[in-house]
């Protein structure tokens, strides 16, 4: 009677809905593992689940007066992690056919993300051979019964959804010690919990996700700022997006790829959202690619119109781009400010009140953005991402990292770079965090000062950029940082050590590719291992395909919700080439993406990048990694820049060429360094060439196309 009344009350107050695979709850041995969002969670499960479960409750809580009062309504057993008999009792209950509920986090979330997963729940599942039924509770965190006060906008009666996910099992891990078996079972359960979160993510477009964040975190919460130092709230950014979107649609057609040549600024974010809401597909153009690279990108995407800014072209000294590229129409945003009519202003005002009506009909699977590869190995390719793939990567990041609305991001990587776009713009916007957009990562003195001045807690960049920030920053500039993430290139040991020694901060290395929106793997405080790029993100499948001549690791192929829709190539303008990959048996499988990277995994699932397939030299029949060559050079001269490439060799097939900024570096030093590292003599180049500065791409990576061309030109050798 009491439970019936509570069910009616909770359904009325919170529009509570139970959905999903309810049949799995009726199996004989069932362990239900919900996430923990509020003090309501236990009551919600007790009154809405179609079975009567036994709740495992920590003994410190079960002894409280309110739990004793609920004893007649709810079955629960005290759980003491320090006493093995508690676990044995739960295993026995499951064996008797009683459904058991354990909250694996052990506490209510204070971040909105998953908290630490205790190993005990996973070990109970493995020991009892139970059917594990993941269950997601969504919405309860916004009630006054949650613990996110000051983090999210509280609501008295939010909608609460209980989703039962497909059942799975946790086999008993094979390990010699019970402690290791317990830990591995806990890691397996953690993976199940992360996959459950990914499974219930909403099906939205970018604009819909932005509006949902605006509702969730507050219409007037500051969310974005640039070098004008005028923060915009979600409503302020919405207003600008409506204005820019209204203008952009005059010069383009629905579904058209629209070029954006703009810096890291609030207006760029507004242009992305504005174009997206009106059914246009923003194509982020790399202004460092030069006339040749930009022409290739425009041709591949059949882009007819490019929106840019006179002020940006002036400050960046980029007028050679519109002057050298005449096949497209250039539209300058400054010229359009005064073109808004009274009708346009009324349209903007009306859609500020009813913003959902501003979006033209779209599906999450539709094209949302075009990003271009760096062109480090040839022509830039257009990478078309859907709303679904971009937002899936944002959700994957939020699943493993505990970003909250209290965080402040420093985003200096350009928005035409996938890392800068997803991690530097979409992730903070969808998380309720505040982001500061800065137009250049190369200002090594200014960026640290802004991190200090704006109280930033999250910084990301390439190893090169982070190393230079550390050189010029004051030790107190980074005092508030809690996440420093390196990606886009291998994190150098001296950069890692400098940050730890000078600032006491551990850099978390990650790995990504533009085609995966871009983050594939990342170290996080909950799961980190030096000299790896972390574990593959939840929701993704991975496999290694063997490569002849390479013994350790294999070619990494990926499949998941964050994979691109396809390529746009300059050879076939406008034609979308869907991803597919050779499975190693000569069969092309659609949906898989071949990264071209040689990767290995350790026993804990941590990923180590060995190098790109194209960055291996075949010398006298032996495969030599060019990254090993660069590692040898860095070990011999760690304060200079080095890049290795190849040139044809009539006798041995290919020969190594090392470009360096160290005028004193000799082959004898490289030989000594190779012996220290245990590297083969075959990896020591004979051709060493001095450059005052390595040619770099806009992302900070070496320009290997230019270096390869330089290597094939005859030049005096230094041995």
Curated annotation (Swiss-Prot):
Any one cellular-component term (Gene Ontology): plasma membrane
Annotated CDD domains: LPLAT_AGPAT-like
InterPro entries xref list: Aas, AMP-bd_C_sf, AMP-binding_CS, AMP-dep_synth/lig_dom, ANL_N_sf, ATP-dep_AMP-bd_enzyme, Plipid/glycerol_acylTrfase
Origin superkingdom: Bacteria
Protein's cellular compartments: Cell inner membrane
Membrane topology term: Multi-pass membrane protein
Record PROSITE patterns: AMP_BINDING (PS00455)
Chain's role: Plays a role in lysophospholipid acylation. Transfers fatty acids to the 1-position via an enzyme-bound acyl-ACP intermediate in the presence of ATP and magnesium. Its physiological function is to regenerate phosphatidylethanolamine from 2-acyl-glycero-3-phosphoethanolamine (2-acyl-GPE) formed by transacylation reactions or degradation by phospholipase A1.
NCBIfam families (UniProt xref): PRK08043.1 (NF005959)
Protein name (record): Bifunctional protein Aas
Protein source organism: Erwinia tasmaniensis (strain DSM 17950 / CFBP 7177 / CIP 109463 / NCPPB 4357 / Et1/99)
Origin organism lineage: Bacteria, Pseudomonadati, Pseudomonadota, Gammaproteobacteria, Enterobacterales
